[in-house]
Amino acid sequence: MSPQTETKASVGFKAGVKDYKLTYHTPDYETKDTDILAAFRVTPQPGVPPEEAGAAVAAESSTGTWTTVWTDGLTSLDRYKGRCYHIEPVAGEESQFIAYVAYPLDLFEEGSVTNMFTSIVGNVFGFKALRALRLEDLRIPPAYSKTFQGPPHGIQVERDKLNKYGRPLLGCTIKPKLGLSAKNYGRAVYECLRGGLDFTKDDENVNSQPFMRWRDRFLFCAEAIYKAQAETGEIKGHYLNATAGTCEEMMKRAVFARELGVPIVMHDYLTGGFTANTSLAHYCRDNGLLLHIHRAMHAVIDRQKNHGIHFRVLAKALRMSGGDHIHAGTVVGKLEGEREITLGFVDLLRDDYIEKDRSRGIYFTQDWVSLPGVLPVASGGIHVWHMPALTEIFGDDSVLQFGGGTLGHPWGNAPGAVANRVALEACVQARNEGRDLAREGNEIIREAAKWSPELAAACEVWKEIKFEFPAMDTL
């Protein structure tokens, strides 16, 4: 008998295919504090029992494969396998279930979102036994989150760097997003910043195209920042998009931004990838740069209710990988975002400890053990009439970003910035005086417009603009 045959015989190997649930469905399992916990929305194919579907998810995202293999006997599956430990039906859905899976921490490389996602949201999402699969939430244990640097700086450090307290920060995406020359682009940045905004932003599409190469844009934007700072006495910034075709080129752009002395750079973290994002976040902490994160491509992943990854998971992953700001929807603007769900993942971005709350889509209690927080960015189809609602919904620790709502002002960019700053200051003052922004918001804006012709003009332009469509992402 060969040594190989002896090994197979000694572990009782029996070739063939057996149900996943025999090994991976463990309803008696008590989860450990060190386990990564996942909540999957599972839609099995007709005839596939929920227990088998949930067990298949646990198996295919951890140690399992479609058939028994003799090398199972060379390791301890009980130590390394994922376990489907609970299954519950989804209210109002006949064939959907929430499958809870526990993964032992040894399955994952320390400090690597890339490795974590490769397992948990890898090949299993194409598994034929499932009609659809969506990752609704993850519980990241402190033992794992402590292996990540997280955001380069966090909310408090950013406020200290900018010397700005007690209100949301104001931003603006430069439009048109594509086609401007570098000098005209810099001019638009200057006008917005001198009008009262804290930040301006490269659109996520802006990298280094023939009409505007990145180095030229960086230089003219830096000039605009320094000129606006000198005139206003406030610290200003522009999100210089360092996203590039290679990690090496991305880092070269970040290094040049640091050499210019600007306060912040930007990255498209989903199209750029988690490995690139984590590398950039480490550089930003080491070199004093803030990092703004755009979520381009997120709706491809998170918008379908039955399949994909919920944005709360992508938000948690970003907090681990690293970013000081991230776009998070508006609730009231043109982009997707239901209020309670949005506030749920906003808290997951900002707060240190978040209790389980299914009414807001939070499946697990999350303890970040002092990992720095991320400022949520509200952006997309918002204007001055939205300011009371945005201030009330997002609170002080946020960035309110008006692109068309600044540059679309009939008098130009600087008056558009003035209108937004006046509206924000009026809302913050009214809130601090105890007024109800949700109920009195329009009146607060009208009162402020009496003393600000720029705000009055903005109110007139956008008085009828609404984006009233039902949210796709509901509980």
UniProtKB/Swiss-Prot annotation:
Residues bearing the modification N-acetylproline: 3
Keyword line: Acetylation, Calvin cycle, Carbon dioxide fixation, Chloroplast, Disulfide bond, Lyase, Magnesium, Metal-binding, Methylation, Monooxygenase, Oxidoreductase, Photorespiration, Photosynthesis, Plastid
Pfam families hit by this protein: RuBisCO_large, RuBisCO_large_N
GO biological-process terms attached to the record: photorespiration; reductive pentose-phosphate cycle
Modified residues (N6,N6,N6-trimethyllysine): 14
Listed name of the protein: Ribulose bisphosphate carboxylase large chain
Propiece residues: 1-2
Species this chain originates from: Alnus incana (White alder)
Stated family: Belongs to the RuBisCO large chain family. Type I subfamily.
Residue positions, PTM N6-carboxylysine: 201
Post-translational modification: The disulfide bond which can form in the large chain dimeric partners within the hexadecamer appears to be associated with oxidative stress and protein turnover.
GO molecular function terms attached to this record: magnesium ion binding; monooxygenase activity; ribulose-bisphosphate carboxylase activity
